[in-house]
């Protein structure tokens, strides 16, 4: 069974200008539009920002900023990363969820970032990356075809 990708990549046409603006800032920490200095990163992240990494670990803003100081991020374009399937949903006044798929050299991940527009500019409230197995369908894991979990005897 294949998924209907339109469900995952639909953006209300009214939001397309916002999507274009935020798409230029993703993947976060890896584009010049997002920023390149600690001051840029501090400005672009809310004081209570946190993220859940592709490994499932949770990281605070302070930890992320210290890590970026020690290991400056690579530019996504210069290392051949490709993002696609961008979609945007308004969560509330001036708050948006952008989702997309990121293909890096060594892995494929689904990304989600919650952005907020402020008088000082865009900032992120939360970010998550989830590793995707190449064998998995968007709708459900391929292993479910053989033995759907809801049919297992308990």
Tell where the protein language model's regions lie, with residue ranges.
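A beta-strand edge to alpha-helix "cap/lid" segment located at domain peripheries
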Residues: 2-43, 48-154
């Amino acid at each position: 069974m294949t998924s209907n990708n339109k469900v995952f990549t639909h953006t209300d046409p009214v939001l397309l200008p916002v999507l274009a603006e935020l798409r230029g800032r993703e993947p976060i920490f890896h584009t010049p539009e997002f920023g390149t200095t600690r001051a840029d990163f501090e400005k672009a992240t809310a004081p209570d920002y946190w993220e859940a990494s592709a490994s499932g670990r949770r990281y605070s803003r302070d930890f992320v900023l210290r890590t970026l100081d020690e290991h400056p991020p690579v530019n996504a374009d210069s290392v051949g990363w490709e993002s696609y399937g961008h979609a945007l949903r308004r969560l509330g006044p001036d708050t948006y969820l952008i989702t997309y798929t990121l293909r890096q050299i060594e892995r494929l991940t689904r990304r989600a970032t919650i952005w907020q527009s402020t008088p000082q500019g865009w900032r992120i409230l939360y970010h998550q990356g989830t590793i995707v197995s190449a064998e998995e369908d968007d709708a459900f894991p391929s292993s479910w075809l053989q033995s759907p979990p809801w049919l297992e005897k308990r």
